Structure formats: structure tokens, C-alpha cells
Amino acid sequence: MARYTQRPENALKRANEFIEVGKPLRALDTLQEVFRNKRWNYAYSETVIEPLMFKYLYLCVELKKSHIAKEGLFQYRNMFQLVNVNSLENVIRGYLKMAEEHTEAAQAQSSAAVAVLELDDLDNIATPESILMSAVCGEDAQDRSDRTILLPWVKFLWESYCQCLELLRVNTHCEALYHDIARMAFQFCLKYNRKSEFRRLCDKLRKHLEDICKSSNQTTGVSINKVETQQLCLDTRLYLLDSAIQMELWQEAYKAIEDIHGLMAMSKKTPVPKTMANYYQKLAMVFSKAGNQLFHAAALLKLFQLTRELKKNLTKDDLQRMAAHVLLATLSIPLPSAHPEFDRFIEADKSPLEKAQKLAVLLGLPQPPTRVSLIREVVRLNVPNLVSDEFRNLYNWLEVDFNPLNLCKRIQSIVDTIESSETENTLLTPYIQSLKDVTIMRLIRQISQVYESIEFKRLLELAPFCNIFELEKLLVESVRHNDMQIRIDHQRNSIYFGTDLTESQREYRPDGPTLQSMPSEQIRSQLVNMSTVLTRAVSIVYPNRERDQRAKLRTQMVQHYHEIKDREHQRILQRQKIIEDRKEFIEKQNNAREEEEARRHEEESRKAKLAEQKRLEQEQEERERKRHENEIQAIKEKSLKEKVQQISQTAHGKKMLSKLDEEGIKKLDAEQIAMRESEELQRERKELQSKLKSQEKKIDYFERAKRIEEIPLFEKYLAEKNVKDKEFWEATEQTRIENAIAERKDAVSQQDRLKRMYPDRDEYLEALKKERASLYVEKLKKFDIALAEERKKRLADRVVRRREERRQAYLRAKEEERFRKEEEIRHAREAEERAAAEARRLEREAEDEKRRQQYEKQRAKEEEAERKIQEDRERLAREVAVERERSEKERDVWRPRADRVERPSAAPAGGASEWRRNAPPTDRNERTDRGDRNDRNDRNDRNDRNDRNDRNDRNDRPERAERKENDGGADSSWRVRREPESQRGTGAGMDRSERGGGGAPSGRDDKWRRGGDRSERLGGDRDRDSFRRNDGPRRDDDRGGFRRDDQPQRETGSNWRDSPRQNDRDNRRTTGERRDVRGAGPKEGGGGVSGGGAGGGGGNWRTAPSPREEKAPPKREQAQDKENKAGDDGEWTSVKRR
């Protein structure tokens, strides 16, 4: 052992020197002294301590010093568990790897030693020493060799695993390493078949899990609340479960299942379906090995449900195989006992109900399953329809059909099918014996319902797969569980069923197929019925007895209570005081203990924090110093390593680098290395392409040849398959016919057997009728009395009901008569109104005709006035033209000849309207014809507008027309007919009489004179031109300029609003509201070019005139227009404003 303290580097050199001279113990002591020295253990980084630790562990493995290795590992963990976890992980993995390598080497050495001993003397294989050793210890040579050579290393490896698990159990940074080591320990137990070590390992892991579930204040503690920790623990327990099943340690497997269920319940996240499927599969296997068929079937059913719901790519064959497995496991469950409470007199441990409840929790079931509930769930999930026909028949034969004579034969056929196909039904073979037992029990129960006694010989014929000893055992078990009443007569070799009528079979109806109840069941129900009847009779005979007894008992109880109430009250108070004192004492003790523990934990944590802080400061200073020293060297080597490493990551780069040594790599730069890499890559690519082409050709030829050779084989296979299918169908059909014949014979025999019971049935019915005759007569009398009372009651009700119906009918007739009279009055009123309306219509027509005649007279006068005015205009125009020519001649006297310009000729002597007279006669005649047609259309439609004209009677009175005539023709002399814009070029200068078709007035002009109807006013240029009454003077492009022939009218001061426009001046109805001009019927006079009515009716005064010479109006006329517009704001016009 070293006598002085030395640095870690020197200690490692000295240890190597001791190893070279063959003193490993001295080397181990030297390295151990370094770890024990508190001065150096935290002063160096992992780069210095890690090689020393590897050497230390190597010596411990060589010398098998597991306790010394444990001490060093704990010291190393304390140094680097918060600084460099990877270093700690590397050290532990390296330690375990060395231990495993030495153990495997020892195993190989042990096998080699046995082989040498066996081949030592071929002539004398069994030596006297080997014979004596085998007789004394019972071991062979391999076992003895393993005990001397292999066992010490196995023990060392086991201790190494335990030390590492104990080392890492509370470190959250090494949690993954902890679970990896646990799996390595499981593999160790499997490899060397160490069952006792496996049990201790399971207990150790369970203890660690309990420790981490408790609260911990350590900074490196593992928390079970983290999802990662829960998942790691769950994976480890699943691995433990697999290992326990492989080693057939079913008790440990069951404990692992409990741990897995606890972890899944603790986890906030739902386990993945794959984990749940693995869990149910292993749980079913454990229940099967434990002989618990009920929970085994329940686990398989849960697995079937999970797989069916979540596995999307489940094939039909897999589903059928799983369904058959579940159905057969469910049907193999032994029939339950009729009185399971008898088991509690036999069980020494917990009651069966508590055990079943605990197992049900593992399956996630609210209550323990039963055979009946599982079969009901299987039927609900449609499992019998998913399996093949033979298993579907198996379910029907055991649970549905009642056929004891053929039951065992049918089940034997299913058993033979399962045993014949061992490869396909490997999972179903373990259920054969259980299925046979269930079949025998079904047979015995069905036989007991048909026969009172049966011989052993006959019963053995019905159950071919059971001998007499097994049958007798099953009969005794049935009686033991009180399932059935059976008596065995060995003298006569017979069995008697249900002979004891004083004892019932069970408290409820037996499950499965049932033909009839046992005699004991009938006796049991008879007694219950008798008790009910007697109780009712006693209550009728003595109605007050029970009430008196209850009152007496209540009085006694009250008296007894008053006697003992004070004593009981004091006793309860005293007991309560004792309990309170005990609680206070326990609470004080708990508080004191908790305060002491908290104080101790606080002191320990404070010391640990101070030590940790000091160590971290020292390590930080040491790392900072080394970092500055290593940065310069690292920068130099970094660039070259990165280039080489980048190239070495590819296969062609590795091949290229393998051709160069280190000196050659150092001589090359990055570009040269990249160039060589590219050359190598191109060469490999060419080689690969050539290989692929040759391979493609080879595969193509081979595939074609193979398919050609397969054709005759396929044809032969199809021919053989057709023959086999036909033979199979014929055999199946023959079997079906035979079964149908057998069933027919069985039904006929059954009918013949039951016919013998007809006389007994008839005798029983006659006797029963004679007994019940008196009771029938008495009930008949009561029924007649009740019938008479009910008849009287219903007759009275019918009288009241009919009286009410007659009253309702009278009221309905009276109401209908009133309604009829009101209808007659209404029809008479409507007829009167129609007659009055017709009289008003005729009156309006007469008035319209009178007004028309007046309008025609007025129109003739206006035409005469217009003609005179037109002649005055022409005369004035000629005078103006003569005056203008004279002035021009006087002006040309002094103007030079070069400046004289030919002036445009003045208007023709005929005046402004001369061109209207000279218009083409065809156009004038066409417009005259159109005016006549419009006039006729207006007269035809006049009847439809009588109502509207009637409201304008007050504006159409003759007095107003006469007043207008007295005013002179100058007032309306400006109303010259204007043509639409489309006709300006042809008839714009035509006289009003000429445009209207000569002197005959048109119907359109008549309507314009009296205002016309709404549709006539809307059909002209008022709507097309969007003219509004408040607009200023129109532009030339809208209506044209002021016409020259309009000037005289404007000078006279006449206003166009003074013209007779009765309908438009008062645009109101008789009720005082304005008419909706735009809402009138269809527009009339729609002919012509512009839709405003051509010919006589097309010359509406709103139509825009043709272009003419523009001349500004006088100021007086503009002022007069403003006055007219101002006065028109509330007048007749209904033209929209802009």
C-alpha cells in the first residue's frame, strides 16, 4: 500500500509498473489511495480521472474484488454525476463489459475442460472415480466443472449488476442506463438459468420503484410523475414479464403484471395499443398456467376486442383464428358451483371473492366475470359467427341444443379435428381436457332431467372418452358442490338422480340447455306457494294479531331503552374520550417525529449543498485553466480532421483513404483529396452500372424460363383440385342425407314415446276440472253481478252523452242559419254596388263624348289662330331679309373688293317654317296615317281609362276651355308640334297641320289638349329625355336652342303652363293623394322611329327639335321662365327631378 500521497498521473504510471512486474494487488492499492484522498478527487477533470478509473476497474475484475469496485464506482459517481454523465456511463458500461467477457471466457474454459476429460481415455470412459462421484453427488462432469470454474465469475457478474443498479437508482441523469442494466441482468439470468437471482432481482427492482414513488428532496432524485420515467419503468417491467415467462417463474410474472397495471394506472397518457395487446397476451398466459380458466378466457376476450377495434390490417384468417381461440377458451371454463359460499369453509387465505375482485382489476373489469357473463359477451361480439362451422356447432351443442344421447359423439368429432391438425390448432390443444370435462358435466345434467336412473354401462356408452373412475370422480364432485342429487348403487351398477324431494337442486335455474325442472325444484316452489297462501289466509282471518304483536314488541323495546339509556350514554362518552386521548397522543408522536426528520433532512441538504458548491467552484477553475491550454492545439488539428472526417463518412471516401497512409494524407491538401474522391466515385459508379445490366439480363432470362416451366404444373394442379372438390362435395352431401334420416328417425321415436303420456294427461285434467267446478260457479255469480252493475252504469253514461250530442247539433244548426243569412245580405250588397258602378261608367262615357266634341271645336279655333300667326311670321321674315340685303349692299360700297366674302344666303322667304311645307309628301302622309292609327287606338282604350278620367272631371269643365279661348290664340301659339330626334332631318320644318296629316286633328293631339292619361304622358319625350321641371335652360344637345319662330310667343308674355293641361295640373285622386304616373299601364303611341309615336301622334310637344341656329333669349324671357318654374313647383307635373 502506498505510504504517501501522489498525483493521479503518477499513480497511474506506478500502477502500470506494478502490473508489469506481476503485482496487481499493489497496483490496485495505489489507485485506490487516489480515490480515498479528498485532496485530489475533485481537483482534476474527467480526462485525467477516467483512464485511471478504467485501470482501477480492470484490476478489480481481474482480482474479483467486487466490493472494492463498488467503492470506486460510488466515488466516481459523486464526482461526475452532475458534471459529465457520459463519462460515468462509459465507465459503468466498460466495467460490465469486462465482467461479461471474463464470465464468457470462464464458460468456454469449463466446457473445454469437460471435453478434455471425456476424451482423455477412450478405452476406459467410465473410470472408478467418475462412478463414485456420480453415486455420491449425482452431478456429471459438466456440473462439477461449472461449479469450480464458471460459478465464481457468474457470482462476480451478478454482484456487478446489483452494484450498478444500486449505484444508479436515484440519479435522474442516468435513468436510461439504469434500465439498460436491468435488462442486461434479465438476460444474464436467462443465459445462465439463475432463477433464485431472478427472484432477488425482481424484489430489488420492486423496492427501487417503491422508493422513487416516495417524495424526495434530492436534486438528482428520480420522479415517478415524469412521463419519460413512467415509460422506462413500464418497458422494463414488460421485459421482466417476458423473461419470467421464458424461465417459467409464474409467481414473478404475476407480480410483474401487478406492477405493469399500477404503472399504467398511474400514467396520465393512455398506453399504446401494442403495449396493451402484449399485456393482455401475457396475462392470459399467466392465468392459463395458474389453471384459472375463467380469467384466462376473460383476458383472451379483452385481447380480441382490442385487436378487432384498433388493428386495421387484420385479415379474415387471423380474425377467424382469434375468434376460435376465444370461443374454445370460454367453452372450456368449468361449470360454476351452485353454492360457491361453501368454499369459504375450505379456504385458509383470503376469500375467493376478494381474489376474483383483485384479478378483475388487472383486466380493467368493474366486477369479476362469470362463465355466463363471458358467454353472453361472446355472443354480443358475434364471435360464434366469425369461427368455422365445426366450432360454431360446438357452441350450439354445448350451450343451446338439448341432445344428451349424441352430445359426446359430436364433441369427440371436434376433439379429433383439433388433434389431427396440430400445426394449425397448436393453441387449441390445451383446452381439450377441459372441454371433455365440461361435456361430461353437461351430459350428466341433461341425463338427470330425462332419466330417474341409468346404468354405468349405458352412461359410459354415451361418454366414450371417459372411463368409469373418471366418471365416478365427476359424480362425486357434483354432489360435493351440491350441484346435483346423485346416488350411486354399486351393487346394481346404477346411478339414481333427484330421488330426495326434501332438498332443492339450487337457488336459481341452471344455465345451459334445460328440458324440465327436477322434482326437488317442483317441491321447493310448491312450498313457497303454500307459504304465500297461508300467510295471506292468516292475515285475513286475524287482521289485528300482527299489529298487536308489533305494538307489544315496540312497547318492550321502548321500556328496555329507558332502562339502559343512561348507562349506555356514559359508556359511549367514556369510549369517545379514550379514543380522543389516543388520537392526540399518536398525533403528538407523529408531529415530533416529522419535525425531527425535517430538521435532519434540512441539515443534510444544507451540508450537501455547501460541499457541492465548493466542489463545483474548484472544478470550474480547473476546467477553465485546461481549456486555455487545449484551445491552441485543438484549432491546429481541427481543420485537417474535419476534411478527413467529411470524406471518411462515405464508402468511396473510406476506400480512397485506405489507399493512403497518414504521411500521404498530411502531404495532400483539400482540393487534391476532393479530386481523388471524385475519381473514385466515378469508377465505382461505372462498375455498379455494368453489374446492374448483367444482373438484369440474368434475372430476365431466369424468370421467363421459370414461368414457362410452371405452366404444365399449374394445369395439373387445377385438374387434381377439381377432382378433389367434386369428391368432397359428394361426401358432404351423403353425410348430410344420412344425418337428416337419423334426425327424422329420432323425432319419430320421440313422438311415439310421448304419445304414451296422453291418457295420464287426460285423467289429470278431468280430476282438476272436477275440483275447480265449485270455484268456477262462485266466480261466475260474482261476474254476473259485476256485469249487471257495469251495464247500468254504461246505459246511464250513454243517456247523458246522447243528450249532450243533441244539444251540440242544435247549436251547430243555429250557427249555420246565421251564417247563411249574412251571406245573402252580403251578396245583395255586392249586386247593388256593381249596378251603381255600371251606372257611373255609362255616365262617364257620355261625359267623355261631350268633352271630345268640345275639344274638337277648340282645336279648330287653335289651328286657325296658328295659321294666322304663321302668315305673320312669314311676312316679318321676308321684311327682315329685304332689310338685311339692303344693309349689306350699303356696307359693301366702301369695303375693298379683296375683303368681300360671299355671305351665306339667308333663310328662304318663306320663313322658318317654309321648309316644313316643302317636306316630301310621302313622309307627311306616313305620319298622318300613324296619327290616325294612334287616334283609333286611343279611342278603343278609352273605356279602360274611364276611372282615371272620372277623377279629372273638375279640370275638364267647358267653362275653363271657353276662358282659354277668350284669352286669344296668342297664349298657346307657341305649341308647335316637334318631331323626335330621329326625324329632324326630314320633317323638322313642317307645319303643325301638315305634320298632323293636314287639317284633321289626330287623337294624340286631342289627348295632349286635355292632358291625356298617364301612359300617354309617360310615352313621350318627357321620360326619354329625363326632363325635370326644376331644370334650367336645356342645352342644344338635349333639346336644341331657342327657335326663331318661338320668339313672338315669348315676347307676348304667354306661359306654356297656362295651356289647358287639366290632368297634369291636378295630378291627384279624388281622395286627395297623387297619382302614380309611372305605374300606369303600357305606353301608347309607341310606333315610329324613336318610340314616342310617329305621324300624328309622334309629334309630341316634348320631342326634341332638329338643329337650328342658336339665339340667346332676352333677359325678360329668362325672368319669365324663372317665375314659371317657381310657380310650377307645386303644380300638376310629375316629371322626375334630376
Swiss-Prot record:
Q: Per its record, how is this protein called by name? A: Eukaryotic translation initiation factor 3 subunit A
Q: Does the keyword S-adenosyl-L-methionine apply?
A: no
Q: How does it assemble?
A: Component of the eukaryotic translation initiation factor 3 (eIF-3) complex. The eIF-3 complex interacts with pix.
What are the subcellular locations of this protein? Cytoplasm
A GO MF term: mRNA binding
Q: What is the source species?
A: Drosophila virilis (Fruit fly)
Task: Map out region (Disordered) in residue numbers.
Answer: 590-633, 817-1138
Can you tell which superkingdom this protein's organism belongs to?
Answer: Eukaryota
* Gene Ontology biological-process entries: formation of cytoplasmic translation initiation complex; regulation of translational initiation; translation reinitiation
Q: Does the keyword Cytoplasm apply?
A: yes
Please give the SMART domains that the UniProt record associates with this protein.
Answer: PINT
InterPro entries, from UniProt? EIF3A, eIF3a_PCI_TPR-like, PCI_dom
Its biological purpose: RNA-binding component of the eukaryotic translation initiation factor 3 (eIF-3) complex, which is involved in protein synthesis of a specialized repertoire of mRNAs and, together with other initiation factors, stimulates binding of mRNA and methionyl-tRNAi to the 40S ribosome. The eIF-3 complex specifically targets and initiates translation of a subset of mRNAs involved in cell proliferation.
Under Pfam families, the record lists: eIF3a_PCI_TPR-like (PF22591), PCI (PF01399)
List the biased-composition ranges (Gly residues).
Answer: 1082-1100
Q: Where is the composition biased (Basic and acidic residues)?
A: 817-903, 923-967, 1003-1049, 1058-1078, 1107-1128
Q: Where is the PCI domain?
A: 319-502
Its chief place of residence is cytoplasm
* Annotated Gene3D superfamilies: 1.25.40.860, UVR domain (4.10.860.10)
Q: Report the sequence similarity comment from the record.
A: Belongs to the eIF-3 subunit A family.
UniProt KW keywords: Cytoplasm, Initiation factor, Protein biosynthesis, RNA-binding
Q: Which PANTHER family match?
A: EUKARYOTIC TRANSLATION INITIATION FACTOR 3 SUBUNIT A, EUKARYOTIC TRANSLATION INITIATION FACTOR 3, THETA SUBUNIT
Which residues are connected by disulfide bridges in this protein?
Answer: none
